Each structure stands twice: as C-alpha cells, then as structure tokens.
Amino acid sequence: MALSVASFSMASVSATQAATDMNEVTAASQSKISLEQALALANKAVKGDIISADFDQEDRNENSHYDIKIVTNNNEQEVSVNANTGKVTKGDTERLDKEDLAEYKAMKQAKVSLSQAIKKANQTLKGKVLEVEFDMDFGKPVYKVEIGKGNQIHKVVVDSMTGKITRSQVSDVDRDD
C-alpha cells in the first residue's frame, strides 16, 4: 500500500511541475521584457559580470520578473527586473565563497560570453529564453540555457570555450488532463 501511495505522490509532483512549467512558459512568452533586455537593464543598474538569470512567474504574470545575479568586487548582487515594466530592484548582496570564486574565475576565462551563449542556444529555436547560467558541467565550464517554445522547454548546454552546443534536451510541458 505504501508503494502505491508513493507512486501516486510522485505522479502528482510531476503533473504539478509540468503545469508550473507550462504556466511559466506562457507567462514568459507574454511578458513585455525579454531576458536579454532584462540583462541590459540589470547591468545598467549594477555594473559587473552577470552569472545567471531566470524568469520567475508569480500571480498570473502581474509580478513576473527576472532574477539576475551579478558579480562585482567578489560579491554577488541579486537584482530583480519586472518582466512587464522593466523596473529594476536591487536585492541581497553576498560575498562569494571559495567554490563560487573558482567558478567565477573559470567564467572570466571563457572565450564565449553569456550573451553569445544565449544567441547560440536560441539560434535555430527562436523561442523565449527562460534561464541562463554559467556552470561547471562534468568539470567543463559551460552555459546552461533554457528556452521555452510552444509546449516545450529546450535545455541547451553551450561550451564556454568554443561556443559549440554540447548537449540539447527537450521537455514536453503540456498538461495531459
């Protein structure tokens, strides 16, 4: 009996996640500000190196925003950009720890910028970029980009040294109800 309850719970979580993803893709596609525009607005407000950005949907798109992290003077500054108005709000600032500093140094050595990685990942898809981040993937410095198009989320990994797409995966987020 416990096994079937656990299976049902996992199915509920998956269905809820799919609905959330679909709502987020829809909200992002309807937002007036793109992730690329949000990056420019955030970098105008806080000068530094953008290390990640992601779309966050709240309250039926009224408060949808982009959460952006910018490194400046070995500190990580959180910035929020309203996805409909472009209003920039500064958030918390944290000192980078050793692991984050090592990752940041790897990003600084990258031959491909975050903006170039976004363009490369979205070159053929022409969807709405939902998320981008610099990361170490199996010891290699990469950019991970999520793009929403239709009822799918495309997860693309771009090598930060060559600009080549090393991995691409599609998730269907359409609800089955």
Feature-to-residue mapping (PLM):
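Long, terminal "pre-/pro-" and other extracytoplasmic accessory regions
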Residues: 1-177
